């Protein structure tokens, strides 16, 4: 029993109603959030003399305070619990690591509908198809669809300001509804109709229509139209050959496979829509030690379906790996309320659904094996680096790089690794300003000062700081970092990574602050770890630099024009569909932009022609 928390007087004040409780430690941090159908009964169970779970014993020993929120129903308690877990990320709760929403394919409600990818709340008018497991799957599908159904994918602002067809029309990837005479409204709507059926999984219906269309065109000697229909038919059949389709009805399912080994849990979700497997994703929730499989699975289930509920497409049936409990039955009610229709959990499925669940379970186990092998590789590399540098332990490393184009749009990056590999949620980019363009020393000094001059939690202090550069960069970095570490409990090792004359991987020179240089064999695991963190930092910096450079170049031409501030620049680019279209626009077209007078349009036109 906890010596910090006197449970007896507290439990006398607790009601038997449903609700949520928050447990705090001595530092006033929320360490656990739970819900209960009967608060008094649940909270009393924590303070029994014989607790059978080591996790519960550890939790109770750290309790200094408990707050209780009473709710009207168990469903309300479930939703409130989810919100609190998301807000506080308590130490003793199972936490969903990947809380991002899934992407969809979006068909707009425009007169000439646009096809695009979408992530987030479904606020725009139109139709949503999905979800897809990741943005790569959406891009691949959009690329495929363009070849079969040439529906436009350009922004509405670009579409409304075109006077001649773009490259997509020239290569047969768009029907060109933006220019009169290229395709009739009826012809475009026909393509959109086929596309809609295809995305709804009604491939055979599309094929029947296209076969009939091809035969009719042949009878009427319209051989070019017949050839187009034939090509579409062949493309759809190739897609069907590659896609596994259920022999059941065209149903929507989520199938949740589960596996847990060596302290790692994986829930693998197969997303099936209209009888087709759209894709899958493995989730690895963060679990406290000694957490039961039932708690892991139910906690994940709750967080997964209650997160982004406004954006997530919840199917009518969810196939589960485990049997139903009181908790899952309450969750089923809550999810149904959020979905606005009945959502049913199914266990022990047979037939095709049973095969789906077996596949999901196998994938979950395979994902754990892959993750364990990856962790083992990373762990071996950390140990090898530790031995090479003569360090007792390495738990955290950071690496910095600078990217610019001839001094333009300088961007610095910081990436973080721990013993499990890249900590991508802690990656950071820094816009570098107020320096002479191309001065990498000044850029490095600025990013290090911004990174380390503020108060750091002891767990965030790295054991090694890598600088992508030679002796000059390293010495400048040391000056800045050493001026910041007076209050740190440990001093990190600072190492420069010089690429050498040939800049070939495996020939890197490593430099210490003492000026010592050394090389590692090209097949050394320690070198592979250094290359990994260096490449991550380099790629992170380049991606940020290119985005910033593109943004700067889009607006820099307009910045020198009197009367054109940030809002008008944005309006011009948005309304006319980009810088290239703006440069082609006439004075009259520019003057149509909201907030742009005819006189200002004349000035803009003349400035862009210089």
UniProtKB/Swiss-Prot annotation:
Keywords: Cytoplasm, DNA damage, DNA excision, DNA repair, Excision nuclease, SOS response. The keyword Secreted does not apply. PROSITE patterns: GIY_YIG, UVR, UVRC. One of its GO terms (molecular function) is excinuclease ABC activity. SUPFAM superfamilies: C-terminal UvrC-binding domain of UvrB, GIY-YIG endonuclease, RuvA domain 2-like. InterPro entries: GIY-YIG_endonuc, GIY-YIG_endonuc_sf, GIY-YIG_UvrC_Cho, Hlx-hairpin-Hlx_DNA-bd_motif, RuvA_2-like, UVR_dom, UVR_dom_sf, UvrABC_protein_C. Residues 16-94 form the GIY-YIG domain. One of its GO terms (biological process) is DNA damage response. Interacts with UvrB in an incision complex. This is UvrABC system protein C. The gene is uvrC.
């Amino acid at each position: 029993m906890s010596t910090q928390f006197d449970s007896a007087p507290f439990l006398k004040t607790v009601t038997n109603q449903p609700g949520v409780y928050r447990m705090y430690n001595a530092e006033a941090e929320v360490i656990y959030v739970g819900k209960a159908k009967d608060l008094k009964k649940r909270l009393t169970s924590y303070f029994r003399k014989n607790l059978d779970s080591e996790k519960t014993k550890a939790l109770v020993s750290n309790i200094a305070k408990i707050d209780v929120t009473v709710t009207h129903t168990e469903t309300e308690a479930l939703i409130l619990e989810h919100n609190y877990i998301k807000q506080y990320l308590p130490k003793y709760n199972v936490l969903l690591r990947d809380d991002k929403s899934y992407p969809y394919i979006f068909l707009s409600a425009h007169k000439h509908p646009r096809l695009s990818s979408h992530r987030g709340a479904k606020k725009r008018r139109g139709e949503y198809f999905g979800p897809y497991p990741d943005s790569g799957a959406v891009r691949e599908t959009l690329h495929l669809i363009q070849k079969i159904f040439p529906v436009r994918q350009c922004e509405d602002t670009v579409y409304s300001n075109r006077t001649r067809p773009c490259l997509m029309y020239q290569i047969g990837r768009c029907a060109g509804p933006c220019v009169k005479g290229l395709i009739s409204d009826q012809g475009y709507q026909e393509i959109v109709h086929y596309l809609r059926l295809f995305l709804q999984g009604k491939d055979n219906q599309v094929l029947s229509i296209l076969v009939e269309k091809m035969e009719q065109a042949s009878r009427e000697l319209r051989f070019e139209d017949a050839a187009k229909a034939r090509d579409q038919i062949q493309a759809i059949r190739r897609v069907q050959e590659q896609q596994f389709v259920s022999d059941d009805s065209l149903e929507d399912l989520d199938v949740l496979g589960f596996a847990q080994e060596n302290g790692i849990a994986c829930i693998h979700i197969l997303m099936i829509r209209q009888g087709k497997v759209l894709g899958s994703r493995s989730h690895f929730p963060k679990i406290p030690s000694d957490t039961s499989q039932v708690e892991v699975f139910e906690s994940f289930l709750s967080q997964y379906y209650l997160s982004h509920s406004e954006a997530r497409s919840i199917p009518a049936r969810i196939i589960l790996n485990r049997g139903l409990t009181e908790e899952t039955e309450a969750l089923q009610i809550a999810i149904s309320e959020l979905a606005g229709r009945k959502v049913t959990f199914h266990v022990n499925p047979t037939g095709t659904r049973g095969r789906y669940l077996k596949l999901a379970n196998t994938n979950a186990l395979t994902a754990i094996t892959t993750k364990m092998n990856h962790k083992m590789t990373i762990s071996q590399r950390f140990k090898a680096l530790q031995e090479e540098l003569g360090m007792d332990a390495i738990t955290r490393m950071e690496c910095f790089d600078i990217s610019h184009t001839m001094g333009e749009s300088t961007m610095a990056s910081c990436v973080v690794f721990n013993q499990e590999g890249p900590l991508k949620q802690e990656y950071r980019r820094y816009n570098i300003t107020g320096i002479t363009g191309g001065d990498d020393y000044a850029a490095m000094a600025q990013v290090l000062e911004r990174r380390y001059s503020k108060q750091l939690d002891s767990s965030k202090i790295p054991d090694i700081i890598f600088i992508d550069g030679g002796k000059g960069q390293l010495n400048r970095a040391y000056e800045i970092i050493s001026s910041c570490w007076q209050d740190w409990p440990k001093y990190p090792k600072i190492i420069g990574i010089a690429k050498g004359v040939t800049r070939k991987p495996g020939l890197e020179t490593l430099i210490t602050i003492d000026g010592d240089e050394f090389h590692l064999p090209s097949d050394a695991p320690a070198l592979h770890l250094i290359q990994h963190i260096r490449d991550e930092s380099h790629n992170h910096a380049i991606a940020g630099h290119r985005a910033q450079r593109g943004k700067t170049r889009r607006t820099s031409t307009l910045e020198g024009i009197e009367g054109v501030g940030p809002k008008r620049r944005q309006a011009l680019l948005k309304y006319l569909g980009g810088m290239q279209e703006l440069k082609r626009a006439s004075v009259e077209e520019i003057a149509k932009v909201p907030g742009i007078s005819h006189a200002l349009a004349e000035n803009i036109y003349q400035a862009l022609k210089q």
